[in-house]
Curated annotation (Swiss-Prot):
InterPro entries noted in UniProt: ATP_synth_OSCP/delta_N_sf, ATPase_OSCP/d_CS, ATPase_OSCP/dsu
Entry superkingdom: Bacteria
Chief place where the protein resides: membrane
Record protein name field: ATP synthase subunit delta
Keyword Transport listed: yes
Function: F(1)F(0) ATP synthase produces ATP from ADP in the presence of a proton or sodium gradient. F-type ATPases consist of two structural domains, F(1) containing the extramembraneous catalytic core and F(0) containing the membrane proton channel, linked together by a central stalk and a peripheral stalk. During catalysis, ATP synthesis in the catalytic domain of F(1) is coupled via a rotary mechanism of the central stalk subunits to proton translocation. This protein is part of the stalk that links CF(0) to CF(1). It either transmits conformational changes from CF(0) to CF(1) or is implicated in proton conduction.
Oligomer and partners: F-type ATPases have 2 components, F(1) - the catalytic core - and F(0) - the membrane proton channel. F(1) has five subunits: alpha(3), beta(3), gamma(1), delta(1), epsilon(1). F(0) has three main subunits: a(1), b(2) and c(10-14). The alpha and beta chains form an alternating ring which encloses part of the gamma chain. F(1) is attached to F(0) by a central stalk formed by the gamma and epsilon chains, while a peripheral stalk is formed by the delta and b chains.
Cellular component GO terms held in the UniProt record: plasma membrane; proton-transporting ATP synthase complex
Compartments reported by the entry: Cell inner membrane
Family classification: Belongs to the ATPase delta chain family.
The keyword Cell cycle appears for this protein: no
Membrane topology according to the record: Peripheral membrane protein
Keywords: ATP synthesis, Cell inner membrane, Cell membrane, CF(1), Hydrogen ion transport, Ion transport, Membrane, Transport
Species the sequence originates in: Oleidesulfovibrio alaskensis (strain ATCC BAA-1058 / DSM 17464 / G20) (Desulfovibrio alaskensis)
Length: 183
């Protein structure tokens, strides 16, 4: 996600509307917005169309209407996307969706992260690690597990803007630096 200030404002506005209507609506708005944003992200031609000033707002709205119908978007999200079309912000949909997802996670008390290991962990081990991290954080954690053989062993945990590198590769790097310094 970029530092798009306008996208953050639009996401906050839609989120505020959803908050007034309850958590179920927040989730529904998130799902609908995500479906529309995913279509824009997956179709470079669609993203170019929404960015291109040569296409009129009416032409963009016509394409958007079909997209909203295919995504099964409700009235509020449809109105929101039409507002984005009027303001020339349809190309910002992926950023708006990303920030909306962050707001929704914060509302639900969910932390998202990634755990990188040198080998694929068994389901039982992944569940145990996730449970332990949730216990330590005191919050629900959604973890993506990935494998990177370059770390040699150990784990690298990325949560938000924090990284805990407990990999063998990092430890060997520290040892190498200490040897160079004569420690």
């Amino acid at each position: 996600m970029t530092g798009n200030i306008a996208a953050r404002r639009y996401a906050r506005a839609l989120f505020a509307i959803g908050q007034k209507q309850g958590l179920a609506e927040l989730d529904a708005f998130g799902s609908e917005l995500s479906a529309v944003a995913k279509a824009v992200e997956e179709s470079p031609a669609l993203a170019r169309l929404f960015r291109n000033p040569l296409f009129s707002i009416e032409e963009k709205r016509a394409v958007l209407a079909k997209l909203l119908q295919a995504a099964g978007a409700g009235q509020t999200v449809s109105n929101f996307c039409n507002l984005l079309a009027d303001k020339g912000r349809l190309a910002d949909l992926p950023d708006i969706n990303a920030f909306y997802s962050l707001l929704l996670d914060a509302e639900k008390g969910i932390i998202r992260g990634e755990l990188v290991t040198a080998i694929k962990l068994a389901k039982a081990k992944r569940d145990a690690v996730k449970e332990q991290l949730e216990k330590q954080a005191g919050q629900k954690i959604e973890l993506n597990f990935s494998v990177d053989k370059d770390i040699l062993g150990g784990v690298v945990l990325k949560v938000g803007d924090r990284v805990l590198d407990a990999s063998l590769r990092a430890q060997l790097g520290i040892l190498k630096d200490n040897i160079k310094r004569g420690e």
